[in-house]
């Protein structure tokens, strides 16, 4: 149903009886009638909204084409190649036709793009090569069409600087790591902004809602804004084959979270990046801006993180709590390395307030959300389980964070002296 905004002066327009606008079928009809009453000159010109109903309208025709199912007529499919852009957080994509449905990334051709237009290559040598790495079903086009997560390489076969997947894949392929079957559960927080003013969804423009408290997991038109986007994203992820495990409204109004996992090794990064892509596309269609800024609003408002839950096979087995404590000890000794890799602008979020630890001080605790590393009460009670790294920012790269956790806890060995000092400082009896 399209709409026409009509000015107030008296006017009447009738579509001729035999006009081409009129569909021959009795099912289809179209008429435009604009009528206004005379108003005195001293009155403001008013407007009336009148409906233009037409199954043959431009909008309907475009929607019909968008919803076309090509499967009965062709084996060819559309593959949307997706990659990470020059900022390390922006996503890019483009489409190509593939002759038949595929089941594995190895069946797909490599492709290329203009890296000088994404900040990833100089103009005189701009070609960057896309290597297909993971396939997901396309919830926007349906059918056998697919989304393809790619990483980025030079023509000579070297990963470009923004390709963090390559190093992560190398770490996860190490037998010491793969043998421990590392699981990751990633909690992606994000904030929805009004398109034209870049202010949180549901907030009065240039002003603030009531203080935090009623919004976390809240219900009601005065507490929650953006649920349709969250739900649409949830279903799109399930359709795509992403291992999404839940969603919830967050502490700051206009902020949401989705969880991915548990996923093994490199899959965690692939699934989070594809989930982010779907969210970007859905907010694009909704006319809402998505931001992963770790502190979108200064002041007494929660920031946005990407808490990462982590366990290994040894942690999940009997006696695993001792393995968890050893992992925490290692993480404490590489705190600076992790912080430097955990997202841009994280110093604005990790202040020691709003359920965060100080960025300058490593800490751990049971059920304590003000620590760097949190251990759940179930894990403590059972003597096995997982740990939660609460330091990563919402704009972190999941390839970096997951592989660094595996590297620090499974491949890196501190000196005995450093280990003893750290254990004493953290009250860890390892």
From Swiss-Prot:
Q: Which residues carry this modification: Phosphoserine?
A: 106
In Gene Ontology terms, what is a biological process of this protein? Answer: glutamine biosynthetic process
Gene3D superfamilies (UniProt xref): Glutamine synthetase, N-terminal domain (3.10.20.70), Glutamine synthetase/guanido kinase, catalytic domain (3.30.590.10)
Per the entry, induction is:
By light, sucrose, glucose and fructose.
Q: Which GO terms describe its cellular component?
A: apoplast; chloroplast; chloroplast envelope; chloroplast stroma; chloroplast thylakoid membrane; cytosolic ribosome; mitochondrion; plastid
Task: List the PROSITE patterns.
Answer: GLNA_1, GLNA_ATP, GS_BETA_GRASP, GS_CATALYTIC
Q: Which reaction does it catalyse?
A: L-glutamate + NH4(+) + ATP = L-glutamine + ADP + phosphate + H(+)
Chain segments carrying region Disordered: 97-122
- Name the organs or tissues of expression: Expressed in mesophyll and epidermal cells of leaves.
Domain GS catalytic per the UniProt entry, residue ranges: 161-430
Offer one Pfam family short name for this entry.
Gln-synt_C
Coiled-coil annotation reads none
Where in the cell does this protein reside? Plastid, Chloroplast; Mitochondrion
Q: Which InterPro entries match?
A: Gln_synt_N, Gln_synt_N_sf, Gln_synth/guanido_kin_cat_dom, Gln_synth_cat_dom, Gln_synth_gly_rich_site, Gln_synth_N_conserv_site, Glutamine_Synthetase
Q: What does this protein do?
A: The light-modulated chloroplast/mitochondrial enzyme, encoded by a nuclear gene and expressed primarily in leaves, is responsible for the reassimilation of the ammonia generated by photorespiration.
What the record says about family reads:
Belongs to the glutamine synthetase family.
Under the subunit heading, UniProt states:
Homooctamer.
Annotated protein name in UniProt: Glutamine synthetase, chloroplastic/mitochondrial
Q: Which organism is it from?
A: Arabidopsis thaliana
């Amino acid at each position: 149903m399209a709409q026409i905004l009509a000015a107030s002066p008296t006017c009447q327009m009738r579509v001729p009886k035999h006009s081409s606008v009129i569909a021959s079928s009795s099912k289809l009809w179209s008429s435009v009638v604009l009528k206004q009453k005379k108003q005195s000159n001293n009155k403001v010109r008013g407007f009336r909204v009148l409906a233009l109903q037409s199954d043959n309208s431009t909008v309907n025709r475009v929607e019909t084409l968008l919803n076309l199912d090509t499967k009965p007529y062709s084996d060819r499919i559309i593959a949307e190649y997706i990659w990470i852009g020059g900022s390390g957080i922006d996503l890019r994509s483009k489409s190509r036709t593939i002759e038949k449905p595929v089941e594995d990334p190895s069946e797909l051709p490599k492709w290329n793009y203009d890296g000088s237009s994404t900040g990833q290559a100089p103009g005189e040598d701009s070609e960057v090569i896309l290597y297909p790495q993971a396939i997901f079903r396309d919830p926007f086009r349906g059918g056998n069409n697919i989304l393809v997560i790619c990483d980025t390489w030079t023509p000579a076969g070297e990963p470009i600087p923004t390709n963090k997947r390559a190093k992560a894949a190398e770490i996860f392929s190490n037998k010491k790591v793969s043998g421990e079957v590392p699981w990751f559960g990633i909690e992606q927080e994000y904030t929805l902004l009004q398109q034209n003013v870049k202010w949180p969804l549901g907030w009065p423009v240039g002003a603030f809602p009531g203080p935090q408290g009623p919004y976390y997991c809240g219900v009601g038109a005065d507490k929650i804004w953006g649920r349709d986007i969250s739900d649409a994203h949830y279903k799109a992820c399930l359709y795509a084959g992403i291992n999404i495990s839940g969603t919830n409204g967050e502490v700051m109004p206009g902020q949401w979270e989705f969880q991915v996992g548990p996923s093994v090794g490199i899959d965690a990064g692939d699934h989070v990046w594809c989930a982010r892509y779907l969210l970007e596309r859905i907010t694009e269609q909704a006319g809402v801006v998505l931001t992963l800024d770790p502190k979108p609003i200064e002041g007494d408002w929660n920031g946005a993180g990407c808490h990462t839950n982590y366990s290994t096979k040894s942690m999940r087995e009997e006696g695993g709590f001792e393995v968890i404590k050893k992992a925490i000890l290692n993480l404490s000794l590489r705190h600076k390395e992790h912080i430097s890799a955990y997202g841009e602008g994280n110093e604005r979020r990790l202040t020691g307030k709003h359920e965060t630890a100080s960025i300058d001080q490593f800490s751990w605790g049971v059920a304590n959300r003000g620590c760097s590393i949190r251990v759940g009460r179930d894990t403590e009670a059972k003597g096995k389980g997982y740990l939660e790294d609460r330091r990563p920012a919402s704009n972190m790269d999941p390839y970096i964070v997951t592989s660094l956790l595996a590297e620090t806890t499974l491949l890196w060995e501190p000196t005995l002296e450093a280990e003893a000092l750290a254990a004493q400082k953290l009250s860890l009896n390892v």
